[in-house]
Amino acid sequence: MTRKKDETPAEKVEARLESFYREKVVPVMMERFQYSNVMMVPKLEKISINIGVGEAAAEPKLLETAMLELGQITGQKPQVRKSRKAISNFKLRENQAIGCRVTLRRKKMYEFLDRFVSLAVPRIRDFRGLSNTSFDGRGNYTAGIREQIIFPEIDIDKVPRICGMDISFVTSAATDEEAYVLLAELGMPFKKKNN
């Protein structure tokens, strides 16, 4: 058996939600949408998490803490996002650091989704379900989170400022209905649809 140099036996272990997708979600989706081939079943391609820190223009330390927190939540180093153009009303210059972003794929993506659905979302105050209208028409879903302290990785005593984030779930689904069923089957707690 040949193994890649950097690959450890722990990396071969599949994420819990990834095996759940293959064993449970794929058959449900094939039956519901009458796909002729397993490869036609939509899948989660990536999760993109973005934190916008507009106040970073005046106080750069806020961006550093946001990057540190995003790194703790995702287990991956965030990318700094810079402004594209100057806007005088916001005291913003071109190429000024105003946010950070992380894109998760494969195993880390499934592990994050598992933690998000089972640990973080239940900790949201007055939670009644995620909005089921935040689909973009192309099978992608974006959830806005108001507080980063819902994640267990964040120590509430060390948080200088509460900030929110946008979490985008990019799927290979052709329609919003397929994406809704896919994410709901993966455990996403949506509000009940009004028919």
Swiss-Prot record:
InterPro entries on file: Ribosomal_uL5, Ribosomal_uL5_bac-type, Ribosomal_uL5_C, Ribosomal_uL5_dom_sf, Ribosomal_uL5_N
Record GO biological process: translation
Organism of origin: Chlorobium phaeobacteroides (strain DSM 266 / SMG 266 / 2430)
Signal peptide: none
Subunit record text: Part of the 50S ribosomal subunit; part of the 5S rRNA/L5/L18/L25 subcomplex. Contacts the 5S rRNA and the P site tRNA. Forms a bridge to the 30S subunit in the 70S ribosome.
Keywords per UniProt: Ribonucleoprotein, Ribosomal protein, RNA-binding, rRNA-binding, tRNA-binding
HAMAP family xrefs: Ribosomal_uL5_B (MF_01333_B)
GO cellular component entries: ribonucleoprotein complex; ribosome
Record's keyword annotation contains rRNA-binding: yes
Similarity-based family: Belongs to the universal ribosomal protein uL5 family.
Name of the protein in question: Large ribosomal subunit protein uL5
PANTHER family tied to this protein: 60S RIBOSOMAL PROTEIN L11-RELATED
